[in-house]
Amino acid sequence: MGAWIALNQFKYFKNQIKGFIGIGSAPEFLERLMWKKFPKKVKKEIKLKGISHIKNGDYEYPITYQIIKDGRKNKVFSKKINSKIIVTMFHGQKDEAVPVSFSRKVLSVFTKAKKRMVVIKNGDHSLSNKLSINKILKELDRFRNTIL
């Protein structure tokens, strides 16, 4: 959800934002990865009760109708960001939560940016292994040296 929130910040802070790094980004996931895949029974429950508890692995998550509606009000894929900044997207090739196509779609939102896509071969959604973290830290250094 972090990249989604950050992309929406361009509405207010476009001139202050100097770079963008996304990690396993999933803007609009509420609609595209959840709502569209929910069975009709779950959608009906969410609409009628305002909430449903969705089990995923060992966890249960409350999904409210309000958050689905809020997600619809904050779409970013249909907008363009014309900032001349550096943008790097990191995504794990073995991410089972979010398809790599989401990070590629985020790149397409930036029309004038210097863009880079880094797909980490054995990376999962968290990109929390040592190799992934080192690649991200190296990119942060590059940003710091380029932007500051």
Locate predicted features.
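The alpha/beta-hydrolase serine catalytic core
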Residues: Q16-T88, G92-K114, V119, D124-L137, ...
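Alpha/beta-hydrolase-fold serine-hydrolase catalytic core, especially in secreted/extracellular enzymes
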Residues: N145-L148
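Short glycine-enriched nucleophile-adjacent loop
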Residues: A3-K14, F20
